[in-house]
Amino acid sequence: METVGLSRRFTKRYPHEFSGGQRQRIGIARALAVDPEFIVADEPISALDVSIQAQIMNLMEKLQTEKNLTYLFISHDLRAIRHVSDRVAVMYLGKIVELADAKTVYREPLMPYTKALISAVPVPDPQIEAKRTRIILKGDVPSPINPPSGCHFNTRCPYAISECKRIEPSLVEIKPKHYAACIRISPEHAHIEENEKAGLGRVGN
């Protein structure tokens, strides 16, 4: 308990007597009880106040350094992911669509879905923020039980062409250690983009 910043006397309390942040610390303490090397942290800071979120992330970073831990940090909070991650995997409808180190994903996203996500993250500098282009995705997220054929993102992608409905892209290395799943940038399907530029393809959703 003390390892996660809680007093030993808290062991005599009932669950309803703890705050959200304290319950998260207890969850971390339980995970540490088996002396793990790898921890899956699924939305560890969701539903917490911003100040408490920062405390939990700082605690996790501290424990990572002290105990040489590896985290799989699952979250919808893009700012938190950027803060704690060395590598980032972006998922859409249960499939990884981009994978690279965190700095690369945030600075040079390749997959259209990733680009849309990053464009939604506010920048503190108002002058830079004013010049940024927000990518607004149209339509609803399809059901993961019955996803669209081809690329699952094709129904919402602003860059989709007819082939995107037919071909399901693989996660391939586009740049050194930077992987993405998109036939329009994949070296495996270079002929598709060549045909599109030559006017032989057709844009459509």
Give the ranges of each region predicted by the language model.
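Conserved ABC ATPase "signature" region
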Residues: 1-9, 118-119
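Interfacial catalytic loop of ABC nucleotide-binding domains
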Residues: 12-14, 132
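Conserved ABC ATPase signature
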Residues: 14-18, 22
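A short, proline-enriched helix->beta-strand linker immediately N-terminal to the Walker B motif
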Residues: 33-37
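P-loop NTP-binding/switch modules centered on Walker-like glycine-rich loops
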Residues: 40, 44, 48, 52-130
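Charged, flexible cofactor/metal-binding loops and thiol motifs
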Residues: 101-204
